[in-house]
Amino acid sequence: MAIFTGAGVAIVTPFKENREVNYEKLGELIDFQINNGTDSIIICGTTGESSTLTHEEHIECIRFAIEYTKKRVPVIAGTGSNCTETAIYLSKEAQVAGADAVLLVTPYYNKATQKGLIEHFTAIAKSIDLPVMLYNVPSRTGCNILPGTAATLVNTVDNIVAMKEASSNIAQVAELAHTCEGKLDIYSGCDDSIVPVMSLGGLGVVSVLSNIAPRQTHDIVAKFLEGDTKGSLDLQLEYLPVINALFSEVNPIPVKKALNLMGFEVGPLRSPLTEMEDAHAKILADEMKKVGLI
């Protein structure tokens, strides 16, 4: 059974002006997502600035999201790390908190070999009794999960069942689907390629766009699954300028700006991330206005 089908939001972590986590605001964001069709909440991922959260904050964000969501949609906890033991610790805490699954990013900076990736993900997955979604984003980690490596993992570790594929390499996604022979659920990790990944058998998207356009992101996937591929593509292309603006600077700088433009008051970023450049922010605002987001 799939962890989820549709559009899952890689939700931001809102901060107060003193940069403490704003849990009240996080609850508002979760309600906004669920009320507008989001199919899953992914907490403490890249978009959630997990790399600048303390372990205590990380675990508390996971606990809060699970308790607040109250099983309305699955909650997937980002628990990956470039330290295997840290990832095991966070994953165990997520299981205790009641997460529906964990999301494990490839180890960053270390640049593990494919053998190292197999050992890393195997150790984490075998430490818990939860479904595991791998997260391949080589542009940020300097490490690429090759299709053969994914096939080895899915064939040897029962609870490794899915991948968020954010390589931006559609040929690699095709090879992944072919090599894993339907045993691995694939989700687009890039908002600009939801439809291409769906056409290769993908089940949906783990989305940044959904933070500001949850209904539309859900509908891109839903239309495709209902057989309305043209409607899905049309909606994907309509929002492409917004998507491009959301990645004109490193994520989550633009999406936090976008949420603040919408009045959500999600607060600042944590250092070393800085506020969006004015020229980029103007383009973002202009594109959001064109589709009625502000």
Curated annotation (Swiss-Prot):
Biological process per Gene Ontology, one example term: lysine biosynthetic process via diaminopimelate
Coiled-coil zones: none
Molecular function in Gene Ontology: 4-hydroxy-tetrahydrodipicolinate synthase activity
Keywords: Amino-acid biosynthesis, Cytoplasm, Diaminopimelate biosynthesis, Lyase, Lysine biosynthesis, Schiff base
Main location: cytoplasm
Pfam families: DHDPS
Record localization: Cytoplasm
Protein name: 4-hydroxy-tetrahydrodipicolinate synthase
Record organism: Lachnoclostridium phytofermentans (strain ATCC 700394 / DSM 18823 / ISDg)
Gene that this polypeptide is encoded by: dapA
